[in-house]
Amino acid sequence: MDNRTSKQNYYLDIADSVLERSTCLRRKYGAIIVRNDEIISTGYNGAPRGRKNCSDIGTCTREQLRIPSGERYELCRSVHAEANAIISASRQSMIGASLYLVGRDAATNELLSDAMSCAMCKRQIINAGIDRVIIRITPTEYRTIPVSDWVENDDSIFSF
């Protein structure tokens, strides 16, 4: 009998560690891209290189403007975890890969059971050639989303 952690939870555990580098004051996300059991890249949400992070300045623009979660991401100082992971990899290495995503509330550190890539990240994931996104729901449970679903159900990318 094999008592080892499943590969999915192994990679989700790594994404959970990556999110500890997040500088967002609202939500912390970690992402890793894996192809053929090899980690291609990692990413967490934070300001673009060389710019001040929300954690450095001690304020969140979206919070100051009372923008609800899931809206008006263009006003966010951060680059999302998925985007940072994609930026750090070559497209060739991502074709057919899986993206593992974990989100936590920055204040409570509780898992976000409803974590989901935003519309902008979904478009980047599609264009990167990634096949599926695995999102942690609980410490041992996850959901798998075939990226082809986002392509076939074009309107679903824009549902909020």
Regions found by a protein language model. Give the residues of each.
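Short, basic/aromatic recognition patches
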Residues: 2-28
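Zn2+-dependent cytidine deaminase-like catalytic core
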Residues: 5-6, 12-13, 41-160
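Short secondary-structure boundary/capping segments within folded domains
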Residues: 21-24, 32-34, 90
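Short beta-strand scaffold segments in enzyme catalytic cores
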Residues: 28-42, 134
